[in-house]
Amino acid sequence: MELPVKVGSNSPIYAADRLNLRVKHVDRLSSLLSNFSLHASTFYSGGFCGVAAYPGDVPRGYVHLLRAGRVTLGSSHGEGVVIDEPSLMLMGRPLAHRVSASDEDGAELVCATIEFDGGVDNPLSRALPEYLLLPLSAVPSIAGAIDWLFSEAFGDDCGREAVLDRLFELMVIQLLRHLMASNQLSGGMLAGLANPRLSKAMTLMHDAPAKPWSVADLALAANMSRASFAAQFREVVGMTPADYLVSWRVSLAQKRLREGRPIALIADEVGYESPSALARAFRRKVGASPREWVQRLA
């Protein structure tokens, strides 16, 4: 039997735990990144001339940083946008695109691939916009990381590749902070984490997915009535709190399955009383059983 996500007023959380639900501050990103870490790999830095095409059928994203000059960013459909000021181009998940420049454009680029643990099933990757194009002047909060990154990319210090990879990872995390702080997200998980009240409830689910969280518990953490909390959660995140908890649990299960963990242990870790209960939730979300899903990865 699948462990229910309770929605009634009688919470299964102990009273002592309930007293701790009104948290004053939560780290909205660390619990995500500790479960689904980010990996960057720098593959180009220097003057750029020509056309570079990137496929959309590989499980990775891309970051392109324009330090100087001009490039054209195009899609697989042929449209293109000219970028003629220092800018950041982020494809957080697979997206076919191309970057082009002529000799006269004087383009200087630094490029990296980005991969989240879990690939395209990673909730952070799914939550990001399909692509972001931002002038660097519009994101002053990441200026320090960008300046350091450019200094490494166009220098010749030893260990530069390792430093560049870490700086790209730092930059993406700072960019996530910027997106949540600037209210540029129309909906989804990151928009929920950007909401001061909803983020408290979401972080509880992220930190302790095995607990049978009720709407009453989560509303208490958000300092809202149950009805207001449930309505606002659905409006901002795009699903009910119960459905979000199931989605988060399944995402964690996918990560652990990739690591080769046995499903019996995974079920207990993510809040299900049996492997069959997890398998039912998994099939509803993914369209396949855990065994079938793992076989597809092979």
Where are these regions (language model features)?
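Solvent-exposed, amphipathic alpha-helical segments
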Residues: 69, 141-152, 200-208, 252, ...
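Short hydrophobic/aromatic patch on the recognition helix
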Residues: 86, 229, 233, 277-278, ...
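A hydrophobic/aromatic-rich effector-binding and dimerization subdomain
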Residues: 4-20, 26-40, 95-154, 172-184
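Basic, helix-initiating cap at the start of DNA-binding domains
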Residues: 91, 192-195, 292
